[in-house]
Amino acid sequence: MIVENIPDEFKKALPILEKIREAGFEAYFVGGSVRDTLLGLPIHDVDIASSAYPEEIKQIFSKTVDTGVEHGTVMVLDHGTGYEITTFRTESTYQDYRRPDKVEFVRSLEEDLKRRDLTINALAMDDKGKIIDLFDGLKDLKNGIIRAVGNPEERFHEDALRMMRAVRFGSQLDFKVELDTFNAIKKNSHLLEKIAIERIHVEWVKLLLGKNPKQGLQEFLDTELYKYCPLFADKYAELKSILEFSDFKLNTEEECWTLLSDVFKLKDTDISNLLRSWKSSNNIIKYVIAASLCVQKIKDSKLDIETYYQNGIEIILTANQIAKIRGFGMDDNELKNNYDKLPIKSRKEMKINGKDLVQEAGVKPGKIMGEILNKLEKEIVFGNIINDKEILIENAKKLLEEKV
């Protein structure tokens, strides 16, 4: 097969391939960028594989960066763009189901492609657009099939994360995991415990954000991978209930965790425990806790001015996306209009600050000043006083007399 219209991202890298070939070595585009080109999807990173060893690549190009020489990877800098070139390699035994004991550089493209995870990712393309397909990856792309390269158990023993990648690609591409690969995942699902949570986290979120998350989630459950993910082992029924939602589209990681928190019926501390076990950032945790409270307020028709002001429109819309999936969402435009009606969106928009209170209202720095600012802020938000400096100073003086 020949790719007639090679994407610009590849065209820009063609001089790299040509220079390697002129030096007497093979070089091909490989991996996800080739797969996505064949699927008509936008491509991101352009990866190159070559028969040249790292030291040979460094002799061919004047500007290189050692990004992973021990694994055969060198970055070539070309007109401000970096291209990672990885030497064809084979990998020996895997003691821990995630890292090879030994990486051996080879001159054979076939040997390199044999060690890749899935047939759809084991495709290469030369500088003329010709596709090298040694494992029927093109057929699987056409038929929407996720299949391990060669013996699936061997692939999953090499890196157990590949099991999560398989079901993630099922969601991302709306493909189905073929039977032998599926059975190998189910048989070896316990090996997922060997993998760092951070790596599983990435695949899990990509699964939920995929084109057909129900497909990926169904296979995630059926293969029993869920049993070996943090705090999911006893959540089969809750996870399965997500499959029953008719409108199931998530757009951000925050939406993913907010939906799960709602389905699991978690409160603040439980949400924090779940997300910490998945190694989420503190910012994500705070965001999801806030959004989860807003989901409940939407459900109870208790979205008030204070909720809009304290959370901001982004968190409100995240909550509403989950509310819509759950069947009780509001119109986004109505929410935006309500938010836009707020007199101020944050304390920074107040026409006075602590310095003004000191100089013009005689307020001394300290607890009283904080209380006065809080009171004035709340009065502005609720529309009880206008956000005008003179008016605010007068109100500050009154509050000072009353000691707030």
From Swiss-Prot:
Keyword Transmembrane helix: no
Molecular function terms from GO: ATP binding; CCA tRNA nucleotidyltransferase activity; magnesium ion binding; tRNA binding
Catalyzed reactions per annotation: a tRNA precursor + 2 CTP + ATP = a tRNA with a 3' CCA end + 3 diphosphate; a tRNA with a 3' CCA end + 2 CTP + ATP = a tRNA with a 3' CCACCA end + 3 diphosphate
Keyword entries, A-Z: ATP-binding, Magnesium, Metal-binding, Nucleotide-binding, Nucleotidyltransferase, RNA repair, RNA-binding, Transferase, tRNA processing
Enzyme class: transferase
EC number: 2.7.7.72
Binding locations of ATP: G32, R35, R116, D159, R162, R165, R168
Biological process, per Gene Ontology: RNA repair; tRNA 3'-terminal CCA addition
Highest taxon of the lineage: Bacteria
Annotated binding of CTP, by residue: G32, R35, R116, D159, R162, R165, R168
Keyword tRNA processing annotated: yes
Cofactor(s) needed: Mg(2+)
Residues the record lists as binding Mg(2+): D45, D47
Any Pfam family: PolyA_pol
Function summary: Catalyzes the addition and repair of the essential 3'-terminal CCA sequence in tRNAs without using a nucleic acid template. Adds these three nucleotides in the order of C, C, and A to the tRNA nucleotide-73, using CTP and ATP as substrates and producing inorganic pyrophosphate. tRNA 3'-terminal CCA addition is required both for tRNA processing and repair. Also involved in tRNA surveillance by mediating tandem CCA addition to generate a CCACCA at the 3' terminus of unstable tRNAs. While stable tRNAs receive only 3'-terminal CCA, unstable tRNAs are marked with CCACCA and rapidly degraded.
Similarity comment text for this entry: Belongs to the tRNA nucleotidyltransferase/poly(A) polymerase family. Bacterial CCA-adding enzyme type 3 subfamily.
HAMAP family: CCA_bact_type3
Note: A single active site specifically recognizes both ATP and CTP and is responsible for their addition.
Subunit text: Homodimer.
Protein name, entry field: CCA-adding enzyme
Species per Swiss-Prot/TrEMBL record: Ligilactobacillus salivarius (strain UCC118) (Lactobacillus salivarius)
